[in-house]
């Protein structure tokens, strides 16, 4: 029986010189230079060198070494010694090695050249062993924790809303149908209507969960299943919500900076510093784009290329505010007639979040629905809530996969998604 792991590889430092430890992980590299042999062991946190030296290491371990292959699962017990030669400044001299499972030759190379994305995603579970991926998803987990902590600190309650629904949240047709016993239902594209309803009871709510959109996109920034961070708060407007988003973004920059050495080691140049985020009126953004030579009309939405171009004036992180009402969902509160109390949060040219002040009076909401060709009767279960004390409220929806992509400077949202689901991919 093998012993339990006592340390992550990253915890094996020169300070542990002379200490017996147990590490567990996968064989990353094997080197044989005669009387000295090396096993580099990988776990989630990094690497550690295990050194076998004739006259110092038990003889039977050289036979075990001969059986080892890359990616074999191992447990190793040994004594830590400080080293001026080992890359990490430390090595382990083993007293015992257990091979828990043998690995066949891998179908893709995770050590040197990176295969094309389609091949990597085909073998995603193997590809996730790559050190760069380990860092990306470890940082992503820390980012989620930080988002939760900020929202809890602002008095929000975490909720979970249905993902099987009977009508569209946005009033469109881009929904995935599912058979729900004897009737057709749909996968939820957003918790928007539920979180609005919850402001009439819980006041401030947020949800982190999957969302589904049957959009036939095939771009670097679109997925059909993604993790959405949604928040809604009573007695707030869009400026209040942007203030909260600013707090989240500053906290995230700080969180990411804690992983600076690991990110730099795998070649990721992340956004780690953030000052106040400028709030750019839509009209000003249109004028700036025209100055840059873009043929953009008032009422047009902005492309990723345009949003990247605006970084020249506003830096890598900025809000665009007060969009034309025609570009926003039906539940968005209007501002001065044709505009709206709305915003997008742009990071490195990518729209990562959108939000607005919402309409909180039933008659105004029904009127907005009719203007857009929607039948209020299809939304009766939602509209009825507005009859019993719906407060003024505002909120945001944030695409977490896009957020990770933008903050870490990745070139494709699939790199920030464990098992991506897009128009052409539904496995593994």
From Swiss-Prot:
Cofactor: Mg(2+)
EC number(s) stated in the UniProt entry for this protein: 6.1.1.12
Annotated localization: Cytoplasm
Region Aspartate, residue ranges: 192-195
Binding site for Mg(2+) 3: 351
Cofactor note: Binds 3 Mg(2+) cations per subunit. The strongest magnesium site (Mg1) is bound to the beta- and gamma-phosphates of ATP and four water molecules complete its coordination sphere.
GO terms for MF: aspartate-tRNA ligase activity; ATP binding; magnesium ion binding; RNA binding
One Pfam family cited in the UniProt record for this chain: tRNA_anti-codon
Site feature (Important for tRNA discrimination) residues: 87
Catalytic activity, reaction form: tRNA(Asp) + L-aspartate + ATP = L-aspartyl-tRNA(Asp) + AMP + diphosphate
Main location: cytoplasm
Subunit structure: Homodimer.
Protein name, UniProt field: Aspartate--tRNA(Asp) ligase
Organism, as annotated: Pyrobaculum aerophilum (strain ATCC 51768 / DSM 7523 / JCM 9630 / CIP 104966 / NBRC 100827 / IM2)
């Amino acid at each position: 029986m093998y012993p339990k792991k006592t340390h992550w590889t990253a915890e094996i430092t020169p300070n542990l010189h002379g200490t017996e430890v147990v590490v567990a992980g996968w064989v990353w590299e094997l080197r044989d230079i005669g009387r000295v042999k090396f096993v580099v062991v990988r776990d989630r946190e990094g690497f550690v060198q295990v050194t076998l030296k004739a006259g110092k290491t038990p003889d039977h371990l050289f036979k075990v070494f001969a059986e080892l292959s890359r990616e074999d699962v191992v447990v190793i017990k040994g004594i830590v010694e400080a080293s001026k030669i080992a890359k990490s400044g430390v090595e382990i001299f083993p007293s015992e090695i257990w091979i828990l499972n043998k690995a066949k030759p891998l179908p893709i190379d995770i050590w040197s050249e990176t295969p094309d994305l389609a091949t990597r995603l085909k073998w995603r579970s193997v590809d996730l062993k790559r050190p760069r991926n380990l860092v990306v998803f470890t940082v992503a987990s820390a980012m989620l924790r930080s988002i939760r902590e900020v929202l809890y600190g602002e008095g929000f309650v975490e909720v979970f809303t249905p993902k099987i629904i009977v009508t569209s949240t946005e009033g469109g047709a881009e929904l995935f149908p599912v058979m729900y016993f004897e009737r057709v239902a749909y996968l939820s594209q957003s918790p928007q209507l539920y979180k609005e309803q919850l402001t009439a009871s819980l006041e401030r709510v947020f949800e982190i969960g999957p969302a589904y959109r049957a959009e036939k996109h095939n771009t670097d920034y679109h997925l059909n299943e993604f993790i959405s961070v949604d928040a809604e708060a009573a007695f707030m407007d869009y400026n209040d919500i942007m203030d909260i988003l600013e707090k989240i973004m500053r906290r995230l920059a700080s969180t990411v900076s804690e992983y600076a050495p690991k990110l730099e080691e795998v070649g990721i140049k992340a956004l780690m510093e953030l000052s106040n985020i400028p709030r750019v009126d839509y009209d000003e953004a249109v004028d700036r784009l025209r100055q840059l030579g873009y043929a953009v009309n008032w009422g047009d939405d902005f492309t990723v290329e345009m949003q990247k171009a605006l970084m020249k004036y506003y830096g890598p992180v900025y809000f665009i505010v007060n969009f034309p009402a025609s570009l926003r969902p039906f539940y968005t509160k209007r501002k001065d007639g044709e505009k709206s109390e709305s915003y997008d949060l742009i990071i490195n040219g990518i729209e990562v979040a959108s939000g607005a002040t919402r309409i909180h009076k039933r008659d105004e909401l029904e009127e907005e629905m009719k203007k857009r060709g929607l039948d209020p009767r299809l939304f009766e279960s939602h509209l009825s809530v507005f009859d019993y004390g719906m407060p003024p409220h505002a909120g945001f929806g944030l695409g977490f996969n896009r957020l990770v992509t933008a903050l870490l400077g990745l070139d494709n949202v699939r790199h920030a998604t464990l098992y991506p689901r897009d128009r052409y991919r539904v496995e593994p």
